UniProtKB/Swiss-Prot annotation:
InterPro entries: Cyt_bc1_su8, Cyt_bc1_su8_sf. The lineage of its organism: Eukaryota, Fungi, Dikarya, Ascomycota, Pezizomycotina. Residues 1-8 form a propeptide. Belongs to the UQCRQ/QCR8 family. This is Cytochrome b-c1 complex subunit 8. Residues 1-62 are mitochondrial matrix. Residues 94-107 are mitochondrial intermembrane.
């Protein structure tokens, strides 16, 4: 595994291959003051990362399910009716009437 540029430079020297514009090592930036860079921040105790999560979860879930409804609903209904038919057929074949009807067909 090859060491990174920071490790080759020892973490404090000039990066290898960059001789023109160097601000300094880690924690020791010693260059000209930069201008025109604006950054905005908000205090961590003023943030609300879960704002609207429950509301969005309900309505986003409804939107996504309703848009996919025609893809999964027909197979769900078909599966329900096939299972219902199979259960009823099994009950009939294991009943007294079903055994009497198919008694001579066993192999």
């Amino acid at each position: 595994m090859r060491p990174t540029q920071t490790m080759l430079g020892g973490g404090g020297g000039a990066p290898i291959g960059k001789h023109n514009h160097y601000l300094g090592g880690w924690g020791n930036f010693g260059g000209m003051k930069q201008r025109g860079i604006i950054s905005y921040g908000i205090s961590p105790n003023r943030q609300n990362p879960l704002a609207g999560t429950a509301h969005d979860a309900v309505f986003n879930t409804f939107r996504r399910v309703s848009s996919q409804f025609l893809y999964w609903a027909p197979s769900l209904v078909a599966g329900y009716y096939i299972m219902n038919w199979a259960i009823e057929r099994n009950h009939y074949l294991n009943s007294k009437a079903g055994r009497a009807e198919f008694a001579g067909q066993e192999e």
